[in-house]
Amino acid sequence: MFPELNNLLSTTPDKTEQGTLTLLCDAKTDGSFLVHHFLSFYLKANCKVCFVALVQSFSHYNIVGQKLGVSLTAARDRGQLVFLEGLKSSVEVLFHSQDEPHPLQFLREAGTGNLQSLYTFIQDTLKPADSEESPWKYPVLLVDNLSVLLSLGVGAVAVLDFMQYCRATVCCELKGNVVALVHDTEGATDEGNDTLLNGLSHQSHLILRAEGLATGFCKDVHGQLSILWRRPSRSTAQRAQSLTYQYKIQDKNVSFFAKGMSPAVL
């Protein structure tokens, strides 16, 4: 995890909110550093994590995780992390016969966009057994990233329904958290992605939007991050609070600073 980002969000692994949906989105830049932050953050917070990884392999996330001080292999072995590797699983679904329903069964059912099997997998993974006391604080669902589902032929409405069920189960019933990344196809005519992004924005308690610089590439400033808190339970004046910072990604950290305040230009 990145300590400076924790400071901006006023949170630590020992002090976290429960029952929240966090939306990560990136526009004209790579926002995967946010996924790595929240993955390592919740593992360090001793949460049970179900990670639906549709973009990269387990080894990729594990290598980055080690740089951030967590071992995904160890977390998986002790049952804290359940990792659904989309790249590997999709090959199994498409080219091998399955005796039982697979979380990515919708790949075989072209045109249906039915994510029921994926939701059932998440539900079974995160729901504690009735007779057991969970050693973990609370459950967390992390998805990287939802835009991939659209590219695989699932409709935006089906993805929104899926996320609504996940939020009802994880956030409301189990008092856990959901974190999901969505690409923002800014300027492109992609109605499905816009529908998904707008729908999730209205449901989210926290939105982190990473975007490239309008002026183009800069060696010392890699992009800017907008943070929007949405607190429905607060008074009207406190419901929405927004901050924007610029950032630079380093090998094992990300540094944040106010616009135009990069150490390289001061």
Curated annotation (Swiss-Prot):
Example GO BP: translation
Gene3D superfamilies tied to this protein: P-loop containing nucleotide triphosphate hydrolases
Domain of life where this protein originates: Eukaryota
InterPro entries the UniProt entry points to: ELP6 (IPR018627), P-loop_NTPase (IPR027417)
GO cellular component term of the entry, any: elongator holoenzyme complex
Keywords: Cytoplasm, Nucleus, tRNA processing
Tissue expression remark: Expressed throughout the cerebellum.
The keyword Nucleus belongs to this UniProt entry's keyword annotation: yes
TM segment ranges: none
Localisation per UniProt entry: Cytoplasm; Nucleus
One Pfam family hit: ELP6
Phenotype of null mutants: Early embryonic lethality.
Pathway(s) it belongs to: tRNA modification; 5-methoxycarbonylmethyl-2-thiouridine-tRNA biosynthesis
Family: Belongs to the ELP6 family.
SUBUNIT field: Component of the elongator complex which consists of ELP1, ELP2, ELP3, ELP4, ELP5 and ELP6.
Function: Component of the elongator complex which is required for multiple tRNA modifications, including mcm5U (5-methoxycarbonylmethyl uridine), mcm5s2U (5-methoxycarbonylmethyl-2-thiouridine), and ncm5U (5-carbamoylmethyl uridine). The elongator complex catalyzes formation of carboxymethyluridine in the wobble base at position 34 in tRNAs. Involved in cell migration.
Protein name: Elongator complex protein 6
Gene source species: Mus musculus (Mouse)
